C-alpha cells in the first residue's frame, strides 16, 4: 500500500481561475469533472479539492504529475452518494485507488491510498 497527501490553498486556485478562467479548469479537469465542479455552489473550492486529489493520487502512485501521468490521466468523480471515486488512465497502472477529499474556507486537502495488484 502507498499513501499520498496534498493540501492546497483555495485562494491560490481561485487566483489562477480568475486569471485564466475555464481554460485553467480544462487544463486540470476532464469534461465530466468540470461538469460536476460547475454544479457546486462554489466551483473553485471543488476545483481545489480535485487539484489536491490528483496531486495526492500522483504521489501515492510514486510518479507525480508529468512523470507518466497527466492531469487528465486521473479522474475524480463523485458517485450517487457523493463519495469521490478515482479512475486512472495510464498503460502501466494496475491496482485500486481510494480517495478522501475535504475543504474549509481556506484549504482543500486530499489523501489517496493506492493498493497495487
Swiss-Prot record:
- Keywords per UniProt: Cytoplasm, Fatty acid biosynthesis, Fatty acid metabolism, Lipid biosynthesis, Lipid metabolism, Magnesium, Metal-binding, Transferase
Q: Kindly list the places in or outside the cell where this protein is found, as annotated in its UniProt entry.
A: Cytoplasm
Q: An example of a Gene Ontology BP annotation on this entry?
A: fatty acid biosynthetic process
Xref: SUPFAM superfamilies: 4'-phosphopantetheinyl transferase (SSF56214)
Single GO MF descriptor? magnesium ion binding
Cellular-component GO terms for this entry:
cytoplasm
Q: Which residues bind Mg(2+)?
A: 6, 55
What does this protein's UniProt record list under function? Answer: Transfers the 4'-phosphopantetheine moiety from coenzyme A to a Ser of acyl-carrier-protein.
User: Of which family is this protein a member?
Assistant: Belongs to the P-Pant transferase superfamily. AcpS family.
* HAMAP family per the UniProt record, alphabetical: AcpS (MF_00101)
State the name under which the record lists this protein. Answer: Holo-[acyl-carrier-protein] synthase
- Which source organism? Chlorobaculum tepidum (strain ATCC 49652 / DSM 12025 / NBRC 103806 / TLS) (Chlorobium tepidum)
Amino acid at each position: 500500500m502507498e499513501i499520498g497527501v496534498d493540501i492546497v490553498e483555495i485562494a491560490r486556485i481561485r487566483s489562477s481561475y480568475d486569471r485564466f478562467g475555464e481554460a485553467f479548469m480544462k487544463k486540470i479537469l476532464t469534461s465530466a469533472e468540470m461538469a460536476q465542479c460547475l454544479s457546486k455552489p462554489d466551483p473553485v473550492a471543488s476545483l481545489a479539492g480535485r487539484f489536491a486529489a490528483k496531486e495526492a493520487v500522483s504521489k501515492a502512485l510514486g510518479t507525480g504529475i508529468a512523470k507518466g501521468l497527466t492531469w487528465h490521466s486521473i479522474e475524480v468523480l463523485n458517485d450517487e452518494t457523493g463519495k469521490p471515486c478515482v479512475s486512472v488512465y495510464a498503460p502501466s497502472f494496475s491496482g485500486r485507488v481510494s480517495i478522501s477529499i475535504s475543504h474549509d474556507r481556506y484549504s482543500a486537502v486530499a489523501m489517496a491510498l493506492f493498493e497495487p495488484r
